Amino acid sequence: MQRKTLLSACIALALSGQGWAADITEIETTTGEKKNTNVTCPADLGKLSPEELKRLPSECSSVVEQNLMPWLVTGAATALITTLAIVELNDDDDHHRNNSPLPPTPPDDDSDDTPVPPTPGGDEIIPDDGPDDTPTPPKPIAFNNDVILDKTEKTLTIRDSVFSYTENADGTISLQDSNGRKATINLWQIDETNNTVALEGMSADGATKWQYNHNGELVITGDNTTVNNTGKTIVDGKGTTGTEIAGNNAVVNQDGELDVSGGGHGIDITGDSATVDNKGGMTVTDPDSIGIQIDGDKAVVNNDGDNAISNGGTGTQVNGDEATVNNNGSTTVDGKDSTGTEINGDKAIVNNDGDSTILDGGTGTRITGDDATANNSGNTTVDGQGSTGTEIAGNNAVVNQDGELDVSGGGHGIDITGDSATVDNKGGMTVTDPDSIGIQIDGDKAVVNNDGDNAISNGGTGTQVNGDEATVNNNGNTTVDGKDSTGTEINGDKAIVNNDGDSTILDGGTGTRITGDDATANNSGNTTVDGQGSTGTEIAGNNAVVNQDGELDVSGGGHGIDITGDSATVDNKGGMTVTDPDSIGIQIDGDKAVVNNDGDSAISNGGTGTQVNGDEATVNNNGNTTVDGKESTGTEINGDKAIVNNDGDSTILDGGTGTRITGDDATANNSGNTTVDGQGSTGTEIAGNNAVVNQDGELDVSGGGHGIDITGDSATVDNKGGMTVADADSIGIQIDGDKAVVNNDGDNAISNGGTGTQVNGDEATVNNNGNTTVDGKDSTGTEING
């Protein structure tokens, strides 16, 4: 019979104080010799006595078993096992029975000499007729499912495990291994066609039933069973099982390699509190193939060897609560529907101490149930669309990722569906390629702690949470590079993201993206954003809050902070540097926005520090602001009722604008000093009616710049800090509109062709309450056209 080697195992039944065991090493399948003998079996076997049944040839064994099988159903198993056991073990070389316990009669040696009996006197010498006749011992019978019967040595070998046997008076056979451990054979059935033998028996204490079938598979029924599989186990084919146990407290020690394919099961246990110690490594391939399956609660599986799962197979599957699986060796899972470890039940624990490599649609760990914990101490590599490192469906899941997490090709590193999930990622994370996600959680109240550094590129996403009240703590540094790449993404209300580590966002990537109301982003680390379409922190939702404690550096057309929604608040304490056209440090699209720039801001080469598009915006620039270069802007607001408080000093150079407001009822309070120099430079620029500018700090304008420039009716400027204006085209205060009011309470010094105050409009009022000095050709203190 052609077949792969199946159970390479020791059959060990350790049962409540006594049992039997033998450690088995790998052997190849052996085909025994047998003769073809025509045998006629009695028609009515049921009428034969046990003694008559014993004398039947082996060819009748299947007939005997068929006739007596109904006894098992009705509970009369004793008659069956008593009848068959002794019959089969007395099988001789040609598969006929020999009930005699004595050796068979020696064959004739073909000699013609006839022995001469001695005479009564005893004087004659009997001539020798040749060599002594020596009885030929029967050859061992080898069956194709790795069982050998040696009647000469009175031994039975199962997969290289040798037992001595004894025939009992009740027809059963007693087995004993070299360590003195015992068991009983109750049933022995030979398949003449395939030359295999099936064994069935009990443990020494009668508590456990065991079977070794024609396929070389071990099936055990009973509690407290132990099976030691020292040799290699190969299982191939649908419905094939290497070791099968039905009972509680089962123990399987798999020291040899476990190789499962074709839909078979390597180890299959049904019962609570099972333990499998798999030291020999495991290879599982093909759909429906399972290396280790346990159906029962409180199972423990230890996979110390390396595991290779492919083509839809499953390494370890537990269906029951409170399961623990320890994968201490390396695990490779390759192919769609392939799974390394699968648990269906609550309170599961999976410890992946070895490295895991998940490829082409496979799943490393899959848990379905509440209160699951996965501890990934080893490194996890996930590559390929549909591939997942750790997948949990259930509430209160916990994943501790101590090893490195590397995800590419559209795979997911950690994927959780359920509320109140927690992920502690200490090992660092690298995610690349579209659809790739390092950590994904679908559920409310998720918490993710990324303590290691994160590198996200080429369209990948580091952490994504879809649910309300999520918290993501990025304590390590984060680098996001490439269009559609995202460091952290949350879709849900009341999200909190804490970026304690530094963030570097490049070439179209996004550091943090939140879609939902009442979001908070705390950026304690420095944020660097470079490249068109790049964004450090992006929020779409009302009542957003961003606390930027670290430095904010934006260039190349990127955005540092971008919020769409009403009532947003940004507290920027760390300072801001913005350069290049289209670059914006802080942008808010929505009404009632509040921005506090407590640190210093440096804006250059066409960049914008703060831009708000919406009504009732308030921007407080408490730190110093420097704006340098054409089309560079410190603060820009497009909306009515805007308020800008420049408490720090402002320096505007070479065509830049300190504050620009487009909208009615705007107010600019310049408590700090304002210095404006260069053609096209403007300190404060407002386009709208009813504008108010309170210039409490000094105003110094030169090189053709404008200190305050308002276009609109009913504008009011209160200049308390004094004003110095020099050079042609330089204007301290310019208003284009009717009904303007200017109050210059401080002293004014105008020189070299400059103009102190200019109003172009009707019904203008200018009050110069301080001293005014005008020096030089084309210099003008106050000019009104209207």
PLM feature segments, named:
Residues 1-786:
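Long, low-complexity, polar and repeat-rich extracellular regions
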